[in-house]
Amino acid sequence: MKKMTINDLIKWKQEGRKFATSTAYDASFAQLFESQEMPVLLVGDSLGMVLQGKTDTLPVTVEDIAYHTRSVRAGSPNCLLMADMPFMSYATPEQACENAATLMRAGANMVKIEGGDWLVDTVKMLTERAVPVCAHLGLTPQSVNIFGGYKVQGRDQEKADRMVKDALALQEAGAQIVLLECVPAELAARITQVLDVPVIGIGAGNVTDGQILVMHDMFGISANYMPKFSKNFLAETGDMRKAVAQYMAEVESGAFPDEAHTIA
């Protein structure tokens, strides 16, 4: 597997080539994903729930993400590695730069931050200082207490239009990837079409340029809850490597997510 860069993903978008991504948290699973040539991995703050047993992502720290970023980088030297910026680690642009530097030194190629156009100055400051950014829109789990739970975002026209404007503003500020979570497929398609940068979806239909799943959902080992948009690929294959290969193949062909795993 060759070393992946953002330029590869931009080229794939231009060519109409879809790609699959996953969360990862340790060297062993990162090595498994690399063996199947998974192009992008995310050290997600979802580790707070799937590894630490918390009820949400808010307790996760920069140090937690940095530790797991080092582990994943050791197992997958060639993936494009994104690292989540945890809750309140980017409240100001200056704070974001300091914490992003920690994650980049740990082996990340890009940081992911949650929020809309209020992050424009932060994205500008990060990218001007050589930190690539993935902007996360839609259901942003760090805002669970504002949303009143994990709910689909962008159903009404006003909120959908706002999300499109946010995506364009963040792209203009320098974001090189946009991640959409739990938004109607029609809205995800609209955003994917208007942006030049790659769009990765989770619970956002199959029109986005890429898809991402939480690793534990892909293997059917999440403790309490399987989201509608997730699929247990291990149950169908009985082998983790085959499960990853099937997930990637179904994303690349457009077979996943199908209607049963899509939010209308």
UniProtKB/Swiss-Prot annotation:
InterPro entries: Pantoate_hydroxy_MeTrfase, Pyrv/PenolPyrv_kinase-like_dom, Pyrv_kinase-like_dom_sf. Gene3D superfamilies: Phosphoenolpyruvate-binding domains (3.20.20.60). The active site is at E181 (proton acceptor). Its EC number is 2.1.2.11. GO terms for biological process: pantothenate biosynthetic process. Mg(2+) binds at D45, D84, E114. Coiled coil: none annotated. It comes from the Bacteria. Binds 1 Mg(2+) ion per subunit. GO terms for cellular component: cytoplasm. Pathway: Cofactor biosynthesis; (R)-pantothenate biosynthesis; (R)-pantoate from 3-methyl-2-oxobutanoate: step 1/2. It catalyses: 3-methyl-2-oxobutanoate + (6R)-5,10-methylene-5,6,7,8-tetrahydrofolate + H2O = 2-dehydropantoate + (6S)-5,6,7,8-tetrahydrofolate. Its cofactor is Mg(2+). 3-methyl-2-oxobutanoate binds at D45, S46, D84, K112. Homodecamer; pentamer of dimers. Belongs to the PanB family. This is 3-methyl-2-oxobutanoate hydroxymethyltransferase.
